Amino acid sequence: MKVLDITASVANGTVKFLLRSPLHGLVSSRVMLITVSGRQTGRLYTTPVNYVRDGDTITVVSRSHRTWWRNLRGGAPVAVRVRGEDLKGVAEVVVDDKEAVAKALLALHPRYSAERAARRAQDRVLVRIKVA
């Protein structure tokens, strides 16, 4: 295991712990937990992700090389923990609309310029979650 992998694993574990604790307010305004089911194994995977919420829609942007979002292609049920609240929803993945990905990046990172968001969108995917 690489040093960066170990560091990321420890950091993710710490963030997961915080988001499940009464101290979630320290990070839960911008970070949530998403739980997805593996398409082939059925195993549950929980990952902390940055998000922005607009009503019943939660938007997440992930790097293309990450694997968790691939289980959501074609639409899939998910569980999320947002600001201390557990919700169920349905997620869809947007891979080919880089303009939509750039727009989502601007919502997640308001200090980005449009050019920076467009550059970063090239190796990102957009996940839209409709929560009930």
Describe every region a protein language model picked out.
Residues 1-2, 35-41, 68-76:
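Short, functional N-terminal and low-complexity linear motifs
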Residues 1-4, 28, 58, 90, ...:
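Residues at structural and domain junctions
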Residues 29-63:
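Short beta-strand segments
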